[in-house]
Amino acid sequence: MQNEQYASMKKNTVDSRNQLGKDPCVRFDTYNGTGPRVLFLGNSITLHSPRPEVGWHDDWGMAASCEENDYVHLLKAAVRELHPDAAFCVCQAADWETVYQTGSEMMGRYSEAREFGADIIIMRLIENCPGLHFDGDVFKQELHRLLSFLNPDGKAQVILTTGFWHHPGDGAIIDYGRKQSLPIVELGDLGEDDSMKAIGLFEHSGVANHPGDLGMKMIAERIFSVMKTYL
């Protein structure tokens, strides 16, 4: 039963290491904006630099058809309708996921995201955490340290999400969110629906199993339904 539950997760064969090449893991959009400051903390679904060897030639959330259609840019557009002067930061932390057990050792590379001074943090991490022998207690401990690092004065509202594909760590995220009184956006059902993926659009099966435009739209809509309360 467990193997069936996580079958979609196992189709994510995109290497979790070095997803950005030599590109920076922290990027900004309208850094000096005077409106709400939104930080996206994520992985390849949030941002993946070009990787021609798997047929991915773009520099946005895998596997949207264009920049405007990934969930980050859809949320940016929705926020800007309310606050045209909003500021945004993307912190791509797939490397943290792969070694979450010792994730604290990696936090220094995210210092620029810490200095951004976020008002809202969208936590979109779990998919690249190794599912075999996943340690929920260690994950919660390290996630808390990471979020505390990115939110040093505690002013930011953190919004948690579960995996796009069902993951053994989803329960740890939900438990952490409940104990910290944080909103949780569940996404795992999307990864069970091939219409939410980029199936048939990429030869590499791992890329194709990432969210396509419809999946990205659904991710953005679910997050914004919670996020708008804090704008």
Model-based region annotation:
Residues N69, L74, E81, G103-L231:
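Alpha-helical cap/lid subdomain in secreted, periplasmic
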Residues M1-L41, I45-A64, R80-E81, E115, ...:
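N-terminal secretory targeting modules
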Residues P24-L39, L47-H133:
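Conserved SGNH/GDSL esterase-like catalytic core that processes O-acyl groups on lipids
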Residues Q2-Q5, Q19, Q92, Q101, ...:
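Residue-identity detector for glutamine
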